[in-house]
From Swiss-Prot:
InterPro entries, sorted: AB_hydrolase_fold (IPR029058), LYPA1-2/EST-like (IPR050565), PLipase/COase/thioEstase (IPR003140)
Keywords from the UniProt entry: Fatty acid metabolism, Hydrolase, Lipid metabolism
EC number annotated for this UniProt entry: 3.1.1.-
GO cellular component: cytoplasm
Family per similarity comment: Belongs to the AB hydrolase superfamily. AB hydrolase 2 family.
Role this protein plays: Possesses carboxylesterase activity in vitro.
GO MF annotations in UniProt: carboxylic ester hydrolase activity; palmitoyl-(protein) hydrolase activity
Species for this entry: Oryza sativa subsp. japonica
Superkingdom, natural source: Eukaryota
Record's protein name: Probable carboxylesterase Os04g0669600
Biological process annotations from GO: fatty acid metabolic process; regulation of plant-type hypersensitive response
Length: 235
């Protein structure tokens, strides 16, 4: 499932959380980019395949890869072969967009929950610097041993990470640890923490997300802008 046709536009690939669909995400996110000045931003909302999830009692739901446990903690180990297969699918979408003529600096990979985990894994292993990666209530689904596999160009992609401190599905510690790891390896990761927020998207996050995308597209480059801090930002 490819992204929008090429041209002088910003491209946002949005990866939903497990149990959701791309159309559900579209209904929630797309209205924030409906203003005329954002008409150049094109979204893609693919839907994950379905599979039986043992930790949900064998329920068949959409999922990008296996879910080993709930809640997800900073120590949760994922089936990395499955994660990498999902990453390959995302890379195919990105390759298609670049081949169609879109500048990598205008491409953003974003996601919620498991989709956020897949987004950051995909960006870290992609051989080009992208416009950015945005993680909502996600985690890092690969062990730290994969750090040596991160291309130098991927390390230049800026990251924005949102996480609620009341999240009971993907614990706050998992998001905090993921962003801290990115900073340890020299990446720009802005972390937005929300004390009362659970495992969901809220208006404040989406408004900040919209402005973040606008700022980067106005630059025409994926490098961080001076106004964004790579320090932990407690809301």
């Amino acid at each position: 499932m490819g992204m929008a046709a090429a041209g002088g536009y910003g491209r946002v690939l949005w990866l939903h959380g497990s149990g959701q669909t791309g159309e559900e995400s579209r209904a929630q996110v797309a209205p924030y980019f409906a203003a005329p000045e954002l008409a150049s931003v094109r979204f893609s909302f693919p839907t994950a395949p379905t599979s039986s999830i043992p930790c949900y009692g064998g329920e068949v739901i959409t999922a990008w890869f296996a879910i080993p446990e709930v809640p997800i903690t900073a120590r949760t180990a994922r089936d990395e072969k499955e994660v990498l297969k999902a990453v390959e699918r995302v890379h195919e979408m990105l390759d298609g967009e670049v081949a169609a003529g879109t500048s990598p600096s205008n491409i953003f990979v974003c996601g919620l929950s498991q989709g956020g985990a897949l987004a950051i894994a995909s960006v870290l292993l992609y051989p080009m610097t992208l416009g950015g990666c945005v993680v909502f209530s996600g985690s890092l689904p690969l062990s730290k041993t994969f750090a040596e596999s991160i291309p130098s160009e991927a390390r230049k992609t800026p990251v924005l990470w949102f996480h609620g401190m009341a999240d009971g599905v993907v614990l706050f510690e998992a998001g905090h640890a993921g962003c801290a790891f990115l900073q340890e390896i020299g990446m720009h990761c802005e972390f937005k923490a929300y004390p009362a927020l659970g495992h969901t998207l809220v208006d404040e996050e989406l408004q900040y997300f919209r402005q973040w995308i606008k700022d980067r597209l106005s630059q025409g480059t994926g490098v961080p802008v001076p106004s964004l801090s790579d320090k932990m930002d407690l809301q």
